[in-house]
């Protein structure tokens, strides 16, 4: 479960474009830039964000069984799950599990 934070750079616009491409199979995605990072929403549900060029989503019961690595988005924050899949269908499946838990 080793949650760690070890970076001090903001997320790049290129990384945002890459992640938005990965999220094409998830409907109603939008984002908000905040303090050099990006918050990600699905139909107005905040489910995660981009932190130091890492795609992190909130920890929810449905994702606990997925074996995802936990990381800190920034010092003092709660751990979040790192999404490192590159398959759009798999990314959509994981994101919708989080969103459904948060609704």
Regions found by a protein language model. Name each.
Residues 1-103:
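Charge-dense, helix-prone N-terminal extensions
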């Amino acid at each position: 479960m080793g949650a760690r934070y070890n970076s001090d750079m903001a997320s790049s616009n290129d990384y945002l474009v890459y992640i938005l491409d990965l999220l094409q199979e998830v409907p109603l995605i939008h984002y908000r830039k905040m303090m050099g990072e990006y918050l990600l929403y699905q139909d107005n549900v905040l489910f995660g964000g981009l932190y130091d060029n890492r795609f992190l989503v909130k920890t929810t019961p449905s994702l606990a069984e997925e074996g995802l690595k936990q990381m800190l988005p920034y010092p003092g924050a709660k751990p979040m799950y790192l999404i490192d899949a590159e398959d759009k269908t798999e990314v959509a499946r994981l994101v919708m599990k989080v969103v459904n838990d948060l609704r």
